[in-house]
Amino acid sequence: MDILEQIIATKRRELAGMMAPKRSLKKALADSPTGIIAEFKRKSPSKGWIHADVRPEEVVPAYAAAGAAALSILTDEPYFGGCLEFIRRVRPLVDIPILRKDFIIDPVQLYQAAEAGADAVLLIAACLSREDCAALTAEAHRLGLEVLLEIHDAAELDYIRPEVDVVGVNNRHLGSFVTDVQTSFDLIDGIRRRITAPLRASALRRAEPKLVFRQTCPKNNFGPPAGEATGPIIISESGIGEPETVRALREAGFRGFLMGEHFMKNPDPGAALADFIQAI
């Protein structure tokens, strides 16, 4: 093999991660008994360093072994002490979905996420216009990435579109970084209305067959095919630290819970997650 052939072979290997089938965050949350997205976060703007010296190779596999449904990895460096390389380093170590958590404002960041081995990306409504959010969602899907759309208040409810895979309520105010889990309870009904309206419209369109079809098929054949997705999964993010909070959120209709700081401030984040799961 000459040098050019070696270079081409290397490039093919580099592209393999981007082209490989992705794991579904939405399905993982729907199927999980815990619904916990465990986050690797070393630092935050409000708390400073939470766990400065820890390596993702130590924490992420322990999260997976403890029963996490999926993983969230901060890749912002200045404010959260993360980097994209963290995803590359842990991707071969776990089989559950990885969310790239960052402030994504440009398609280039989607290409980075896909190349690094992420399965899903975070899109923050507060960072994007509605048009840009829709365009980034479409491009993410073209790359095989799922989208977690994050909202913070009722004004952002109209960012929710049927094609979004997961809708998350961030209980942390991005201006003050103060957390209040009540935000999730306040928004859940509005989210449900936004999700179910297009589903109802779609079902009505399906139930408008031609007359001859109506005469030859039983009524109970109308509607979505078996196994078809029924809209985005709803999750709650930030400020969750007690098992009772998870139980209350689950009762309200949330299927997933993104948690990081509660585990990362522990000397053994994986063990902290295992204990938390036992308690819920």
Q: What residue spans do the PLM features occupy?
A:
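Short, low-complexity intrinsically disordered segments enriched in small and basic residues
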Residues: 196-230
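Active-site regions of enzymes building and remodeling cell-envelope glycoconjugates
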Residues: 165-167
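Solvent-exposed, charged amphipathic helical/linker segments at domain boundaries
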Residues: 128-144, 152, 169
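Glycine-rich phosphate-binding active-site loops on the catalytic face of alpha/beta enzymes
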Residues: 112-132, 169-177, 254-273
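Thr-Gly-centered strand-to-loop micro-motif
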Residues: 74, 100-101, 123-124, 170, ...
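Residues marking helix boundaries in flexible regions
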Residues: 189-192, 196, 222, 278
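Conserved N-terminal beta1-alpha1 strand-loop-helix module at the mouth
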Residues: 1-98, 105-108, 139-163, 174-184, ...
